[in-house]
């Protein structure tokens, strides 16, 4: 059943599109389904202040699905802005709302066109200004006239422009008065120099410098005493010079050390390749000796085979001659 006491009807796509005419509801306040309540206007104003009735994401037709139906939200706000033709006096709240609206409009214009950005008009300055206005609105809503301690953080270009104007005025005054020496250093550098000089004139700073100088003097005196007590050799300077020369030579050697190491590594690799080549060459030499021995043995065998063949051929020829003689005798 729905919240108003009627059934939920779900129709398929193929159902007929005939809509039954619903009976007009009885708007009689004495109807048993109507509950009469009393509403406190002040409490309702406190509860629903700055809230807007938004039904875009709410669905009251379905009572089966368990959904949270919150129609009131504070994600939207209404700005009370008076137009140019408004003849009445503009209140403080309306002025603050108008400033917020103009700041939002400026933000949109800057986002749409980057060329509108300047050193005095950018997203950071507008954000700080919006924070200021919101703090003022909060203070006004709370009924307090507290002083806002937050300062709008403007870029350094404004101070630089002020310094530039101050420098120009000083230059004009110096030119009008007729100063003999016109300084070329900027005012900020001159101020920093004066600050440093004033700090050097500070009693605590001067006393600290005096303590450091006294400590250095005592250390130097101790070093002189140790040198006098130890009777340093005259040859110490020569030894120090020799060590210095050795260190200089070592610096040169250190500078050429990586290239020398690379050369040694290359020679080592070449030596390994030579050893490998020598092993292969000795192996080939042994193979050659074996082949020469086998060739010599083959030649000897061929010579023996030729001599034996000649003997056999001679014996065969003699036997053929004997056979021919016997055949001739038989004829």
UniProtKB/Swiss-Prot annotation:
Residues 22-33 have a biased composition (Basic and acidic residues). It is found in: Cytoplasm, Cytoskeleton, Microtubule organizing center, Centrosome; Membrane; Cytoplasm, Cytoskeleton. Pfam families: Dynamitin. The keyword Acyltransferase does not apply. Residues 1-33 are annotated as: Disordered. It comes from the Eukaryota. One of its GO terms (biological process) is centrosomal and pronuclear rotation. Residues 90-123, 209-249, 280-331 form a coiled coil. GO terms for cellular component: centrosome; cytoplasm; dynactin complex; dynein complex; kinetochore; membrane; nucleus; pericentriolar material. The keyword GTP-binding does not apply. Keywords: Coiled coil, Cytoplasm, Cytoskeleton, Dynein, Membrane, Microtubule. It is a peripheral membrane protein. Its main location: cytoplasm. Belongs to the dynactin subunit 2 family. Subunit of dynactin, a multiprotein complex part of a tripartite complex with dynein and a adapter, such as BICDL1, BICD2 or HOOK3. The dynactin complex is built around ACTR1A/ACTB filament and consists of an actin-related filament composed of a shoulder domain, a pointed end and a barbed end. Its length is defined by its flexible shoulder domain. The soulder is composed of 2 DCTN1 subunits, 4 DCTN2 and 2 DCTN3. Part of the dynactin complex that activates the molecular motor dynein for ultra-processive transport along microtubules. In the dynactin soulder domain, binds the ACTR1A filament and acts as a molecular ruler to determine the length. Modulates cytoplasmic dynein binding to an organelle, and plays a role in prometaphase chromosome alignment and spindle organization during mitosis. Involved in anchoring microtubules to centrosomes. This is Probable dynactin subunit 2. It comes from Caenorhabditis elegans. The gene is dnc-2.
